[in-house]
Amino acid sequence: CPGGTASNVLTYLAKGNVALSVSITICTTLLSPIVTPAIFYLIAHNSIEINFWAIVLDILKMVVAPVFIGVLINALLNTVAKKIFVFMPFISSVTIMAIVAIVCALSAEKIGSSSILLFVIVCMHNILGIVVTYIISRLCKFNKQDSRTLAIEVGTQNSGLGIILSLQHLTAFAAVVGAIFSVVQNI
């Protein structure tokens, strides 16, 4: 899944390179309608049926369309947009919490039997991604600010999108990983 706006905020708070963070977020968001379904297909097509074009359309509806609508509203109705945008962080947070709660409710039985293992795996995945990215970027002679930014970008993804795609194209239990990741990436 592409990076989310949270990575831009975390980069700012960590005194990283915000311009680099925003650029990466824009690129991953624009590439996500093709890259995300391609990754789904490459990883899972032998195990389950993957409808590539359905995933493309879902990402366009959930990620790309809202971005363009937001830009359009901001351009055409700037005064109204400023009033609306004040509430968007709260609405986004409540929406993600509701999605996580629904996913957990749908998979409560399976979560109970594997929650610790799943939590450890998701934590290790996230920590390793952040640490390895930082180390490799430093070895490639990136400065500390850019290395910090890249590490944050790798460790912060649009987990809401991952949850929804898992619910629609996999199983409710698969969405649990996204729900756990949503919590872990914000710790």
Regions found by a protein language model. Give the residues of each.
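Alpha-helical transmembrane segments of multi-pass small-molecule/ion transporters
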Residues: C1-I187
